[in-house]
Amino acid sequence: MSDVARILKEARDQGRLTALDFAKEIFDDFIELHGDRNFRDDGAVIGGIGRLNGQAVTVVGIQKGKNLQDNLNRNFGQPHPEGYRKALRLMKQAEKFGRSVVTFINTAGAYPGVGAEERGQGEAIARNLMEMSDLKVPIIAIIIGEGGSGGALALAVADKVWMLENTIYSILSPEGFATILWKDGSRSEEAAELMKITSGELLNMGIVDKVIPERGYFTSEIIEAIKTAIVDELAELSQLSTEDLLEARYQRFRKY
């Protein structure tokens, strides 16, 4: 098995810590909030408010399940438009009250079903991209498993984008890439090599800003490493004026 194939397998492993795990372990007194106030709550997206070193922070994440029933409830981590609208509601609330935003991303992509399209999946993702680019509080996005397509990017227009070591971030799945390019989804490992989807490759290209080492999925070291990094980064970002914060975010994505 190639290194890319190993990372792809580990990124998709059901045993990985989830967005909710990170929210509860890193932030004190985390309170989950629900609903987009338009249609319904989406179990694939979690969000709420917690405290980090006494500072209130808004946390949003894409949640995969840990077993079959949980995955059915979470739609296998594929958000509907109401999930992205819930995320945006919480981020705009954070802006109103001056809270920083931290997002945790693990999704193969936004849900492509008929109902999701009818309710404006494309519009919901596009609106998140637009609103996050101008959100007047610090944003940190962390890829904790799969970072698939616009479904991941809809929570990743951030001042800093980080990845755990054994995760991926890509425009679509390697299987989808192979199917489009060669009409053969079984060539996904070959596609993954071409796509440059691993954390090390993306760090070298300047697409992500930090790679957090992993020593297994379940260790407290990962929690502590992420917590320390978030505390340090938010302290730096909070020193910037709103104008400088937004300009730096704009330039970060403009360079692509």
From Swiss-Prot:
Q: Which GO terms describe its cellular component?
A: acetyl-CoA carboxylase complex
Among InterPro entries, the record links this protein to: Acetyl_CoA_COase_a_su, ClpP/crotonase-like_dom_sf, COA_CT_C
Subcellular location(s) per record:
Cytoplasm
Reactions the enzyme catalyzes: N(6)-carboxybiotinyl-L-lysyl-[protein] + acetyl-CoA = N(6)-biotinyl-L-lysyl-[protein] + malonyl-CoA
Name the Enzyme Commission number(s) assigned to this protein. 2.1.3.15
A molecular function GO annotation: carboxyl- or carbamoyltransferase activity
Example GO biological process: malonyl-CoA biosynthetic process
- Give the protein family: Belongs to the AccA family.
**Its job:** Component of the acetyl coenzyme A carboxylase (ACC) complex. First, biotin carboxylase catalyzes the carboxylation of biotin on its carrier protein (BCCP) and then the CO(2) group is transferred by the carboxyltransferase to acetyl-CoA to form malonyl-CoA.
Tell me what this protein is called.
Answer: Acetyl-coenzyme A carboxylase carboxyl transferase subunit alpha
* Taxonomic classification: Bacteria, Bacillati, Bacillota, Bacilli, Lactobacillales
